Amino acid sequence: MTCLHRATGPAHGPHVSIDLVVSQYGNDMTSKTSSDNLCPIARSLTFLGDAWTMLILRDANSGLTRFDQFRQSLGIAPTMLTKRLATLTEEQLLEKRQYSTRPPREEYVLTQAGRDYLPVLFMIGAWGRKHRGEGKLLRFVDAQTGTDLQPIAIDAVTGAEIGTRGIRMVVPE
């Protein structure tokens, strides 16, 4: 079940009038395969929804490609890293390439699908800076200009910033 809500009237102090609509959108997260799920967010979260996966993609964007580099950067257990790299390769966000035959060694590089995920990743970073920004934090800067990234999501059709207009989920026929 998915809960959708929308404000139906002006806010009066800390109170907002809410209509709550509960609808079935095929978002059963207990489904054995993500392809059964109608929601593209739910499908994506089946393999992108954990911190290790997102941090591996962050590090791949920063130029890390080898197992030991990811392990050192993240402090992740080898078995966990092996599983996450296998999933990211299977889901085609990373491509495994052999860089040495003796001994056989492989590296992992971002695919187009992995590069397409980067705006989402840096939006999460911007949200974290804004809402969890206490203490010292890394800054993400444009490599050419050195200016801080300030990512926003814009709807390509309307030009409106995502989050400034209502969004509905529409079930396919």
Which residues does each predicted region cover?
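Membrane-interacting alpha-helical segments
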Residues: 3, 13, 17-28, 71, ...
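Short, Lys/Arg-enriched N-terminal segment that forms or immediately precedes the first helix
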Residues: 22-45
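C-terminal regulatory/oligomerization modules of transcriptional regulators
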Residues: 2-24, 122, 126-173
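Extended, folded domain segments that form the structural surfaces/walls around functional sites
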Residues: 57, 65-70, 85, 117-121, ...
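N-terminal helix-turn-helix DNA-binding core of bacterial DNA-binding proteins
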Residues: 39-80
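Canonical helix-turn-helix DNA-binding module
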Residues: 67, 71-99, 103
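Basic, amphipathic "hinge/linker" alpha-helix immediately C-terminal to the N-terminal HTH DNA-binding motif
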Residues: 49, 100-121
